[in-house]
């Protein structure tokens, strides 16, 4: 079977640590090292205590596999995601180019990254609710 990319966890941001002295207090995190905290682009995101969509759930957690959490476009390479307005180039933070072979059906963001910052919208909230709950 082909590899696929799947949403396997979530984190609702409760606090952003941007000051180096605050980052160093979180000594167990990889981004709290002197090498990381001496730069200007380092941030540490701490989870909220509870998930705002469902306050019975913690602010961060793991999710079991479910087809509704599969990002990969069917039949495509794992890094080509099915098109979704919520995470298209107009609705994410940062400048990314869609390099998919068929940009109408799929999204392909080149580069090494783990996180994708989505712009807040009603559509984003409903999408998050549909995959988390």
Predicted regions and their residues:
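Contiguous surface segments at macromolecular interaction interfaces
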Residues: 3-8, 15-133
